[in-house]
């Protein structure tokens, strides 16, 4: 995987992620591992500043382990390994998973038969911000 430090490559391999198809999604950002989030059409989401929506896996490991763009809400992660048409086919089971690395590892282990979609955290039940990062209290339903 180009543009990745050895420690980041090792981290991904330990978790079952080895595909060269993912080289544009994962990159080393200083000491941290950057993970670019893509829409189902393969184009990157944008954060509140207009930059690509990138979640960083912080190294060394601490709390938090991941850092999302400030003021940009949450985004689902759609893997470039997802077969075309999976989101439209209601006969394919949808599996929600916490985190992009696990999604990519699942597609490498089980390439067909399931539609894996990643969430940035299991506590994220409703994103209260719009695409520009603005919050409207009138639309906040506080799902539990």
For every predicted segment, state its role.
Residues 1-33:
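Short, small/acidic-rich helices and loops at N termini and domain boundaries
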Residues 30-144:
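Phosphate-handling DNA/RNA-contact segment within nucleic-acid enzymes
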């Amino acid at each position: 995987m180009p543009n990745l430090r050895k420690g980041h490559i090792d981290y991904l391999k330990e978790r079952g992620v080895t595909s060269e198809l993912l080289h544009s999604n994962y990159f080393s950002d200083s000491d941290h591992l950057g993970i670019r989030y893509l829409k189902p059409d393969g184009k990157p989401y944008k954060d509140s500043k207009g930059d690509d929506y990138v979640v960083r896996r912080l190294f060394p490991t601490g709390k938090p382990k991941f850092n999302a763009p400030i003021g940009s809400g949450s985004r689902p992660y759609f893997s470039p390994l997802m077969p075309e048409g999976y989101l439209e086919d209601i006969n394919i089971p949808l599996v929600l998973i916490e985190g992009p690395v696990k999604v990519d590892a699942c597609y490498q282990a089980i390439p067909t038969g399931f539609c894996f979609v990643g969430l940035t955290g299991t506590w994220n039940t409703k994103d209260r911000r719009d695409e520009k990062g603005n919050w409207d209290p009138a639309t906040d339903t506080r799902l539990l």
